[in-house]
Design a protein with these regions (language model features):
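Extracytoplasmic ligand-binding site segments that recognize negatively charged/polar headgroups
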Residues: 1-107
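Solvent-exposed loop/turn segments at secondary-structure junctions
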Residues: 16-17, 24-27, 44, 52-56, ...
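A bilobed periplasmic-binding-protein/Venus flytrap-type ligand-binding module shared by bacterial periplasmic
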Residues: 18-25, 60-64, 141-156, 172-175
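Periplasmic-binding protein-like
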Residues: 76-86, 125-149
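Paired acidic/hydrophobic, glycine-rich loop segments that form the ligand-binding mouth/hinge
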Residues: 92-93, 109-114, 130
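A ligand-binding cleft/hinge motif common to bilobed small-molecule-binding domains
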Residues: 112-128
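Mature extracytoplasmic/periplasmic domains
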Residues: 148-216
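Conserved C-terminal helix/tail region of periplasmic/extracytoplasmic solute-binding proteins
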Residues: 211-245
């Protein structure tokens, strides 16, 4: 990440947020639109990861806003209307652990606000869950490393960043046990495809075919960010109202 000519951090991993779903109940075709959240099969079984930014960003895309977070008053009204229309579908608002358990045991069959960073962990352990990026688009989170000013371990930090951005480090990072992620290094993709082709395929990181990078090029992915034309407190206050409705 650069500001003017100054490098502040180095991107190492990223991932997409879309429609997380139980594949025994909802197919990838079903999950190809956020409208699946209104499906009768989801009634009482729609979960929310309890953080307003990814959820309302997704609802903004579902409402037809061209930009998920840079929206005017009319666009913000549409976000609130679209979100409130789902309230009767919701089975709960969950923290990190609750999101895992409620998806794993089938308590929730669809989830908003998350992506493969959660469903991938479950899927690799045999759970029938997956994240599908819907036609309306998905969001991207990004993980980067910086070296803190005044650090006492500069050389160690520098060596870590050098390793994690190397092809081997990138391939290891993609399949991290805590949560899987996409990687930006083409050479890292090559190593991953050679050493762990199943995971490369699962994460749509196979070279020479339509893959995750094409979704970005096609404009289907937007960055998760702060609201531009509303205050953060406006989004947070609405989220609290939604939860209490």
């Amino acid at each position: 990440h650069w500001q003017d000519d100054t490098l502040y951090s180095v991107i190492t991993r990223f991932g997409f947020l879309g429609v997380a779903h139980n594949t025994d109940v909802l197919s990838e075709k079903d999950a190809a639109s956020y409208s699946v959240f209104s499906d009768a099969r989801v009634t009482g079984k729609l979960g929310h990861f309890d953080w307003h930014l990814p959820n309302l960003g997704q609802m903004s895309l579902a409402a037809g806003n061209g930009s998920a977070y840079d929206i005017d008053a009319a666009g913000w009204d549409k976000v609130q209307e679209t979100t409130m229309a789902l309230r009767g579908q919701v089975g709960g608002f969950f923290d990190y652990g609750g999101t895992f358990s409620s998806l794993n045991d089938g308590q929730m069959v669809a989830f908003a606000g998350i992506g493969d960073w959660i469903t991938g962990v479950l899927e690799k352990n045999g759970a029938k869950v997956r994240t599908t990026i819907p036609e309306e688009g998905g969001l991207q989170w990004t993980e980067s490393f910086s070296i803190g000013k005044g650090t006492q371990n500069y050389e160690m930090a520098r060596k870590w960043i050098q390793w994690i951005t190397s092809p081997e480090g990138q391939a290891k990072s993609a399949d991290m046990a805590a949560y899987p992620a996409l990687i930006p290094s083409k050479k890292g993709w090559e190593v991953l495809n050679a050493t762990n082709p199943a995971e490369a395929k699962r994460q749509n990181m196979v070279l020479g075919q339509h893959n995750a990078m094409d979704m970005i090029r096609e404009g289907r992915i937007q960055y998760r960010q702060l609201p531009v034309q509303q205050g953060l407190e406006d989004w947070n206050d609405f989220w609290s109202d939604y939860k209490g409705a």
